[in-house]
C-alpha cells in the first residue's frame, strides 16, 4: 500500500513517466528547452568598465551557465585579435574569464561593504546573509550561493574573523565561491584541429 512496484527489466521506460509541462520526450527521455545567448566582447578590465564592460557582465547575469569558447590553436591574443602563433592559451583564457567575473562580483560586494558590515555587527550572522543576498540578487544569487561563499571564506581562512574585519582577500574568496556556484563554466575548444602542443 502506497509503495511503487520495482521496475521490471523488460520495461522500456525504465520507470520513467514523461509528461512534461514544457519541452517534450523522445523515447522516454526528457527534452528540456534552453535558451542560449551569445555574449561577445569581454576584454581585460571589463569589471572596471573597459570594452563593453559592465554591459557584458550584466548580460551574463541572465545566464544559468556559461560556455566559454576558447582558441585552442593559440593564434589570438586574450582580446580575440589574430596574432599568429604565440597568442594566449586556453588555460589563460579560462583564468582570464574567471578573474574578470570574480573581480566583478567583488566590486559589487565591496561597494557598501563597510555599511553592511556595521549592520552585521549590530544584527548578527543572519544580517550578513541578507546583506550579501541583497547585493547579489540582481545577478541571480540565492541563499545557497551565499552560504557556500561564507563557508568558503571560513574554510580558506579560519582566522578571517568577523565580516567587518574582512580584507579584500576574504571578499575575493567569497566572490569566487559564489561565482563558481552561480556561473558553472564549460569550455569549448575552437580551432582544436589547428592546436599545437605549445598552445596548451
Show which residues each predicted segment covers.
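Conserved C-terminal guanine-recognition region of P-loop GTPase G domains, centered on the G4
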Residues: 23-31, 52-200
Amino acid at each position: 500500500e502506497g509503495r511503487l512496484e520495482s521496475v521490471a527489466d523488460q520495461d522500456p521506460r525504465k520507470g520513467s513517466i514523461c509528461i512534461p509541462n514544457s519541452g517534450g520526450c523522445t523515447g522516454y527521455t526528457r527534452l528540456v528547452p534552453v535558451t542560449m545567448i551569445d555574449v561577445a566582447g569581454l576584454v581585460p578590465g571589463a569589471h572596471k568598465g573597459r570594452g563593453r564592460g559592465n554591459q557584458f557582465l550584466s548580460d551574463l547575469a541572465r545566464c544559468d551557465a556559461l560556455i566559454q569558447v576558447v582558441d585552442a590553436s593559440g593564434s589570438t591574443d586574450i582580446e580575440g585579435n589574430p596574432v599568429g602563433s604565440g597568442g594566449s592559451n586556453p588555460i589563460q583564457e579560462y583564468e582570464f574569464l574567471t578573474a574578470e567575473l570574480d573581480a566583478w562580483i567583488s566590486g559589487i560586494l565591496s561597494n557598501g561593504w563597510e555599511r553592511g558590515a556595521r549592520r552585521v555587527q549590530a544584527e548578527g550572522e543572519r544580517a550578513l546573509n541578507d546583506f550579501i543576498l541583497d547585493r547579489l540578487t540582481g545577478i541571480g544569487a540565492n541563499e545557497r550561493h551565499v552560504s557556500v561563499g561564507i563557508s568558503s571564506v571560513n574554510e580558506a581562512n579560519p582566522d578571517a574573523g568577523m565580516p567587518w574585519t574582512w580584507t579584500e582577500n576574504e571578499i575575493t574568496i567569497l566572490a569566487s565561491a559564489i561565482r563558481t556556484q552561480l556561473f558553472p563554466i564549460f569550455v569549448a575548444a575552437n580551432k582544436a584541429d589547428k592546436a599545437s602542443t605549445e598552445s596548451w
